[in-house]
């Protein structure tokens, strides 16, 4: 069976940009920067990914993708315990937990997601064991059964990214009109002014 990745782990460029949108953690949890970002979870520390960017919300995804055979792959190294959690809106349930003593080697743990339509959200929790562990990646995948016509969309939070957004809009405005994508700009934080947008 073929699988398609529909969501991956998102991490900020720096810990100062987290604001609880990417991850929540106990004292000692650190963002490791570089080309392949990761999270370090110290011994007895916890990181919880029930957040805006890293929680998985089945009802929203069901509008755009088939959620058959849904599973979550978590890549870690070091010593940690990985849990798949979900909420039905009233309580939090741990669907599966696996202890990983991978040392320096990366190890991937796969969780099958039971009946995603009856859950409001799924997320991963990681607890650091002896000498701590690293959360390297998370991918949410589903079976590919049929092709669907797709209109691609790129979404970016404009908060503290005004220069990048304006720069990209200027580049797009210089494209040939036939190849130029349609742009919808929603500035919820009201940080952009009308004269800034090309």
Predicted features and spans:
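A conserved acidic beta->alpha catalytic loop
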Residues: 187-196
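Secondary-structure boundary/capping signal
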Residues: 162, 180-181
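Short alpha-helix adjacent to the SAM-binding motif of class I
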Residues: 167-168, 195-197
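Hydrophobic/aromatic residues located in beta-strands of well-ordered beta-sheets
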Residues: 183-185
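Short, acidic, metal-binding catalytic loop of nucleotide-sugar glycosyltransferases
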Residues: 169-180, 191
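N-proximal low-complexity "stem/linker" segments adjacent to membrane-targeting elements
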Residues: 3, 9-11, 15-67, 71, ...
């Amino acid at each position: 069976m073929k699988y398609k990745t529909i969501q991956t782990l998102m991490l900020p460029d720096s810990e100062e940009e987290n604001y609880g949108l990417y991850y929540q953690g106990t004292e000692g949890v650190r963002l490791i920067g570089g080309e392949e970002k990761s999270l370090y979870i110290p011994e007895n520390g916890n990181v919880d990914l029930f957040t805006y960017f890293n929680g998985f919300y089945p009802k929203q995804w069901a509008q755009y993708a088939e959620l058959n055979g849904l599973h979550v792959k978590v890549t870690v190294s070091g010593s940690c315990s990985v849990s798949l959690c979900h909420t039905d809106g009233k309580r939090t349930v741990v669907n599966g937990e696996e202890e990983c003593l991978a040392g320096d080697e990366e190890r991937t743990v796969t969780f099958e997601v039971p009946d995603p339509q009856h859950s409001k959200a799924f997320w991963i929790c990681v607890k650091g064991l002896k000498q701590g562990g690293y959360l390297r990646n998370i991918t949410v995948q589903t079976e590919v059964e049929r092709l669907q016509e797709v209109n691609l969309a790129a979404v970016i939070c404009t908060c503290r990214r005004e220069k990048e957004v304006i720069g990209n809009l200027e580049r797009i405005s210089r494209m040939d009109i036939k190849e130029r994508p349609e742009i919808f700009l929603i500035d919820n934080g009201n940080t952009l002014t009308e004269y800034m947008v090309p």
